[in-house]
Amino acid sequence: MKKLGFTRSSRRCSQPQEREQESERSRRRLRRRLSEGLLLLVALTVSGGLAAVLTPTPQVAVADEDSSALLRTGKQLFDTSCVSCHGANLQGVPDHGPSLIGVGEAAVYFQVSTGRMPAMRGEAQVARKDPIFNESQIDAIGAYIQANGGGPTVARNPDGSVAMQSLRGTDLGRGGDLFRLNCASCHNFTGKGGALSSGKYAPDLGPANEQQILTAMLTGPQNMPKFADRQLSFEAKKDIIGYVRTVIEERQPGGYSLGGFGPAPEGMAIWIIGMVTAIGLALWIGARA
């Protein structure tokens, strides 16, 4: 009986302890769950913040009203003047016109501002003539081609206007060396142009402005090769432009250049002047005798 009473009293004493231990375990489990939830919340917050900071902003092209109007105008001009030869999707038309995909607004500026496009007829080489589009129309067509086909762009001033005077490099000696190395074999050392094979020719650079010379080097129109930045850097192109415009515009220190075509016309002029002088002198001597 005593043992039984002792056992019952022990059980009664142990029950509060068990309840207290169970309560402590419950509190520990609750604290663990709260701490785990808090850590998870902190981790999600930090990872979300890092993702927001480090993820690059998507490059979404959003055209404003002005650019949209420019593209609409360009498409209208293209559809009325260019689509019959170059195709509705710029893919080109066999035996009529090449693809315009990848030529960029630089090619549009050169071809249209020099009057070569639209072409009046098919021939070995399209000659320069007065342009039929004004500057704003050329910009619109160029913007449409650039938006749909991509390619080299026109160099512009900070205000968005087409760059001209700023394209003239200052190292004219370097520009002259580069011109003689890369261009003079076709365009003559003074930029007067020259004949090529199959009815083709290198045109006179005299009427070309700075932007037209640059875009010609970027796009390689007709028989001209392209000059990528790996061949001629942008600064090298500017020096060539500066040299060409200086040679064309400045007075020749040697006197009248006879068109700048080189020794052939100069030799012919010397021969004619010499023969006329000799004949005149002979007649004068004969008359005195």
Curated annotation (Swiss-Prot):
InterPro entries: bc1_cytC-su, Cyt_c-like_dom, Cyt_c-like_dom_sf, Cytochrome_c_Oxidase_Subunit
Lineage: Bacteria, Bacillati, Actinomycetota, Actinomycetes, Mycobacteriales
Binding-site residues, heme c 2: C183, C186, H187
Boundaries of every Cytochrome c domain copy: 69-149, 170-248
GO CC terms: plasma membrane
SUPFAM superfamilies: Cytochrome c
Subunit structure: The cytochrome bc1 complex is composed of a cytochrome b (QcrB), the Rieske iron-sulfur protein (QcrA) and a diheme cytochrome c (QcrC) subunit.
Keyword Cell membrane on entry: yes
Molecular function GO labels: heme binding; iron ion binding; ubiquinol-cytochrome-c reductase activity
Transmembrane segments: 37-55, 267-287
Biased composition range(s): Basic residues: 1-11
A Pfam family hit: Cytochrom_C
Gene name for this UniProt entry: qcrC
Membrane topology value: Multi-pass membrane protein
Reaction it catalyzes: a quinol + 2 Fe(III)-[cytochrome c](out) = a quinone + 2 Fe(II)-[cytochrome c](out) + 2 H(+)(out)
UniProt entry keywords in alphabetical sequence: Cell membrane, Electron transport, Heme, Iron, Membrane, Metal-binding, Repeat, Respiratory chain, Translocase, Transmembrane, Transmembrane helix, Transport
Positions with a binding annotation for heme c 1: C82, C85, H86
EC code: 7.1.1.8
Disordered, as annotated region: 1-28
Name of this chain's protein: Cytochrome bc1 complex cytochrome c subunit
Subcellular location: Cell membrane
Posttranslational mods: Binds 2 heme c groups covalently per subunit.
Job description of the protein: Cytochrome b subunit of the cytochrome bc1 complex, an essential component of the respiratory electron transport chain required for ATP synthesis. The bc1 complex catalyzes the oxidation of ubiquinol and the reduction of cytochrome c in the respiratory chain. The bc1 complex operates through a Q-cycle mechanism that couples electron transfer to generation of the proton gradient that drives ATP synthesis.
Organism in which the protein naturally occurs: Mycobacterium leprae (strain TN)
